[in-house]
Structure formats: structure tokens, C-alpha cells
Amino acid sequence: MNPIQSFHCKLRGLATTLDSETARLLRALDGEDSDFEDSPGRILHDLHSEVQTLKDNVNALLDEARLENQESTRFKKATKILMEKNSADVRKLREFFQKYGYQARDKEDSGCEHRVNNSTPELAVCKDIQKAGVKELSDPCVPSGSVSEEPLRSPQLSDFGLQRYIISQVPANPPQTAASLKEERVAETPPAKDPSVQVLKTPRCALRMDDFECETPKLEHFGISEHTMCLNEDYTMGLKNMKNIKSSLLSGVSGEAIGTGPVTSDNSFAIPGPIIQQMEENDVEYVSSPLPPKFCTPGLKIPSTMDRTDLVSIDYPLSKPNSSSTDLEIKDCVPLILNSDECYQSFAEPPSSAITSCENFATPSPPKVTAIPEDILQMITKHSSNLASPLDVKVMPRRKGTRGAANKENW
């Protein structure tokens, strides 16, 4: 129902109510209605309030209708703009496709789709026409009215306005006939499988990593590196030469110790005699003791309290040489343990060393003032005016970039 019609109906009912109430009030004023209890002013106020609520409701309904009208108008405008854009895009696409030989279908072919008829034979004819059109589209070698007779071609630079970048003109492929196309299709189709021939499947290879063994040998470390390679070679040759020398000495003289000097031969090189040791665990105690560390402080001399020439070395009896050629004797090795009583007997009191001028840490002598600058002299004369400058002190000229003390507030 239209809100305006409902509003008029309510307004008509209100007018009739007002007429009846006005007549009743007039009768009450004349004294005809003795049972009237409410005052006429209250009734009039109620009527005015009802009319005001009705007006508010009508205004709200009108606002809602106006908003809906505006939204519908806005939707129509947006739809028109979108339709115009779509039509422009379709037009551009049609022009772009026409450059490559595309032609739009005729209206007569698509007329059967929009034609609505109640007869069944006509619908069957229309379906047959549609199926024929689909077959023509799928088969490009059969010419028809709906499909363009020109074959599709690849895009060229001339289509985009870039003719000057063409280097060489490639001749187009000659048009193929229907027979050649059929032969190519037959050649491309794979041969049919013969059901009588059974192809055996390749069995899967199961990987067993537990039973896998590496065929390459393991890499073992023989203790040969860039630091020990030359030493191993030298000492190996030395041991071979030492074996020959020792056997000759033992045969000539028995019980004599081998000399500590380097041994040479005609077909061998010099071997350091005092560094050869027996390769046994019991000979560890014959290792030479290291030298004590030396601490050096610049500008400070510490007198030495120990003289290494006074140390008394004690020679311990060495183990008897065995008859086997693999063992070697230790020669000229400093013993690891020394007798403490004999060591401290040779200690002497160190002589007192003279202290040089560099080592004297006394208070330095005060500097001698030979000249007083001019700015310092002005400050001294300002505080004590009776002070007379000595004759030997010369006033030096003011240096560049210095400021006087007289105008100190304006610095």
C-alpha cells in the first residue's frame, strides 16, 4: 500500500474524530452531557500529540523512500557506465581479432537460438544446425560460411606499427590441402596396441643399506704430515746408518760408549749424536730440563742471582747397551733431577750494580724561567703594582691570536 494513501486515510479518520470530539465538547459546554469528567484542554493536547507523531512517522517514511530512490538512480548510472565500457572493450577486441583474419558470425546462424517456438520439429532442426556449426568450428580444413576462409597467421611487426624493425621476410607456409592434413593426422596418431602382446613390467629394485659395504679401502692415518715428514725420513736413514756403525764398533771395542759428536760416513749424512734416545718407556726420566724464563722490564735492571756455569751436574749411570741393534744409547743429556745441596753451595752474593741517571726516580730539578710573556706580566703587575720586574727578565712581544686581560669582559 502506498504510504501517501495510508497517510490520507489516517488523516481522514483523525478529522472525523476531531469533529465528533468537538461536537461532544460543545454539548458539554451547553450542559447536555453531565457525565463528562475530563477537561477539554487535556483532550485537545492529546489530539495534538497524536497528530505530531503521525507527522514524524510520515517524514521518516518519506526519507527512506527518497534514499531508496537515490540508490536506485546511482545504480542505474553505474550500470550504464559499465555497459559503455564493456561495449568499448568488445569493439576493441573485435578490431584486434579482425587483424588476424577473424570474422564475426552472421546473425542468421545465431537466430535459431533466440527464436522461441512451441513446435517440436523446428526445435530439432535448430539443434541440428547448432551441432553442424560446432563441427565446422572444430574442423578448420572444411570451409563454411561462419568460419573465415583465410587461415590464422602469426602476429607480425606491421600489426603493431613496427615495420622498420623487420630484418628478413620469411615466406609464409603454402596452404595445405585436405588430403595432406589427413595424411599428417594419420602419421601423428600412435599405433594401436596389440592385446595379444604382453609387456613384462620391470621389477623394482629394493635398496638394502644395512648390507651395503664400501668397496674402497678405509683411509688410515700413519702419522705423516707436513711437519713430521722430513723428520721421519731423516731419522729413519739415521737409524739405518747408526745400526751399521754400532755393529762395527761393538765388534772392535766392547764396553766403550759412543762419542757425542756427529757421526759421518762416506755414503750417509751427519746425524746429531746427543739427541738420539732410546724408544722405551723407562728412559723418560733422562729428558733435559728446560731453561728458566727471563723477565725483562725496560729501564730496570735486575741482577742475575743464578749463574748457570756454577751448577754442578750429576751424571747417573746409564743402562747397559743391549746386543739388539734397535736400541740406542743416550749421550750428553742434561739430568732432570739435580742435588739441591750442591747447587746452593756455588751460589754467590750478587755484586751491587751502579744506578744510572735513567734509573734514578728522584724528584726532578725545577725548570729555569728565562723569559715571561707579556700577557702574564700584565696580570702580575695588575695584582701587585709595587712589583718591579727583574733586569734579567725580558718582555716578549704578544703572540698572534692571543687576547689581553684588560678587556676580559668583552671576550
UniProtKB/Swiss-Prot annotation:
Location of the region described as Binds microtubules and contacts the microtubule-binding domain of SKA1 in the Swiss-Prot/TrEMBL record: 195-410
Where the protein is mainly located, per its record?
Answer: cytoplasm
Location of Phosphoserine modifications: 34, 119, 138, 154, 158, 289, 324, 352
Q: Where in the cell is it found?
A: Cytoplasm, Cytoskeleton, Spindle; Chromosome, Centromere, Kinetochore; Cytoplasm, Cytoskeleton, Microtubule organizing center, Centrosome
Q: What is the annotated signal peptide range for this record?
A: none
Q: Name one GO molecular function term.
A: microtubule binding
Annotated region (Required for localization to kinetochores) at 349-410
Q: Which residues carry this modification: Phosphothreonine?
A: 189, 216, 297, 363
Q: Which GO terms describe its cellular component?
A: centrosome; cytosol; kinetochore; meiotic spindle; mitotic spindle; outer kinetochore; SKA complex; spindle microtubule
Source superkingdom: Eukaryota
Q: Which keywords appear in this protein's UniProt record, sorted alphabetically?
A: Cell cycle, Cell division, Centromere, Chromosome, Cytoplasm, Cytoskeleton, Kinetochore, Microtubule, Mitosis, Phosphoprotein
The ranges of region (Binds the NDC80 complex) come to 102-410
For the biological process aspect of GO, one term held by this record is: spindle assembly involved in female meiosis
Q: What's this protein's family per the entry? A: Belongs to the SKA3 family.
Q: What assembly does the database describe for this protein?
A: Component of the SKA complex, composed of SKA1, SKA2 and SKA3. The SKA complex is a homodimer organized around a central W-shaped coiled-coil structure, formed by the interacting domains of SKA1, SKA2, and SKA3, each end of the 'W' is extended further by the C-terminal microtubule-binding domains of SKA1 and SKA3; the complex forms extended structures on microtubules. Interacts with the NDC80-NUF2 heterodimer of the NDC80 complex (via coiled coils); the interaction localizes the SKA complex to the kinetochore and is required to establish kinetochore-microtubule end-on attachments.
* Purpose: Component of the SKA complex, a microtubule plus end-binding complex of the outer kinetochore that stabilizes spindle microtubule-kinetochore attachments, promotes alignment of chromosomes at the mitotic spindle equator (chromosome congression) and assists suppression of the spindle assembly checkpoint. Kinetochores, consisting of a centromere-associated inner segment and a microtubule-contacting outer segment, play a crucial role in chromosome segregation by mediating the physical connection between centromeric DNA and spindle microtubules.
Protein name per UniProt: SKA complex subunit 3
The species this protein belongs to is Mus musculus
